[in-house]
Each structure stands twice: as structure tokens, then as C-alpha cells.
Amino acid sequence: MKKIGALVLALSLTLSLTACGQKAEQTAAQEEPESGEAEPVELVVFAAASMTETLTEIADLYQDAAPNVTLTFNFGSSGTLLTQIEEGAECDLFISAASTQMNALDGTLAQDAEKNPDGLDMLVPGSRIDLLENKVTLAVPEGNPKGIESFDQLAQLLADGSVFLAMGNSDVPVGQYTQKIFAYYGLDEAALAESGVLTYGSDVKEVTTQVSEAAVDCGVIYATDAFSAGLTVVDSATPEMCGQVIYPAAVIRGGNEEAAQAFLDYLQTDEAMAVFESVGFSPAF
């Protein structure tokens, strides 16, 4: 009788342990993500203000390609974005409106005190590319009240003190391109500013707004911003006047490097490039 009781007890324990094991396996299976489902990723992208409309549209498209990725954008002047990155702001991918700001983070230029004065090495090796090309344009408010037709005419009007021009600050790429145009025409920016014919914007969007609101007679902005704002472009600067307008992009060290590279690769696809080209960008790679 004792043997039978012991046998029943052993059988009960075996069944109990089996049931517990099955329950644990079911719980573990429920906790595991479905096969092929990628882990959620938040990707922080710092990009020039002139890319606001295009990258916002591309972000919606990218959801289909990478539904696990949440894109967070920080748009602003490239100079401001550079400063934020240098000060330790979280950033996975940087897209600048000029090479100057990207050079300041490029470790391959660490020995070049002019291009990388602080000797920083913050870019993932091999990730830097020239992504896009833009154009510097002369845009006017609706109706073109001042009758401005070209950069040649603008130079004369500035010299005469008979025009009011909006341009970017000196730490903003669009402002730096404008300074090159001044140099091309032999104009003294300091003298022009003192005479009251210039007003400044902290980024290209601010300059564009001044033109859109007819607060100025004209403004020097990118072709893409003029298109997005529905402004009339009366002239475009040649490379001889201000050089090429190249937008470099690179993955920043220490963040979500793999996901950032994947998004940068996507920006070079036909689907993404169609969005860029629709507003006036062209591929630079």
C-alpha cells in the first residue's frame, strides 16, 4: 500500500513539473518578438533647415521600408547644428548645407587646422558622402516691386544704397555663399551693413520668410526654399560666383550607427531622390 502511495505521489509531481514547464515555455514564447520583427530604434537626424520639407516627406516613405525606426529631426542652420554636436547633443546622422561644418567633425582632416580647427574625429569612417547639390538664387516678393532682374543689377543697387536685401548670418551656409557673391562683385559687406541696405536671418528659412512677407526687396536663398515658398527666382548664382552648393552627410560616432547608415543609404535611392529632385535638389554622389 505504501508503494502504491509513493507511486501516485511521484506521478503527481511529474505531471505538475511538466505543466509548469509548458506554462514557462508559453510565457517565454509570448515575450519573444515575432520572427523577423526588428527592435524599435529612435534615430536622431540633424539636418540643414533647407531640407525641412523634403526630409519630412521622406520620413513618411521610410516608415514602409523600416517600420521599427522612429525618425526625430532637428532642423536648423548648419552652424548651429555643428555647435550642438560639438557640445554633445545626441545625433546619429548629420546633413549640412556646406562642407565647412562637416569638415569640422571629420577626423581625416584632423591635421588641417583651417578645416578642422579643434581636431575632432566624430564621423564614422567611410560614412561621409556628398549627398545633394542645391543652387543659390536671388528671390523677390510677389510682384517684384523693385523690378530686380539679376545679381548684376543687385550689385549696382547695393552700391547705390537703393535696395534692401535679406541674407543669412555669417555662420549660416547661405550667408557664407552670399558673402562670396559680394566678394565676386567687389562689395564690402561691412560698409553695406552700415549703410542699412542689409538685414540678416539666423537660417535660410528666416531669410525666405522676410522675402515672402515683402519685408525686403529681395533675398539670397536656395532654389529649393524659393520653390517651397512659391517665390519668384530672378537669377541663379554660378559656381564662379560662390562655388558649388554641396550638402554632405555622415553618420556620427557613438549613436545608432547601423540604423543611421541604413537611412543614409535610403536617402540615395531613386524613391528618396525623386522627392529631393521635385523641389530642385540634384544628386551629388
Question: Where do the model's predicted regions map?
Answer:
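Active-site charged/polar residues at nucleotide-handling catalytic sites that mediate phosphoryl
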Residues: 88-89, 214
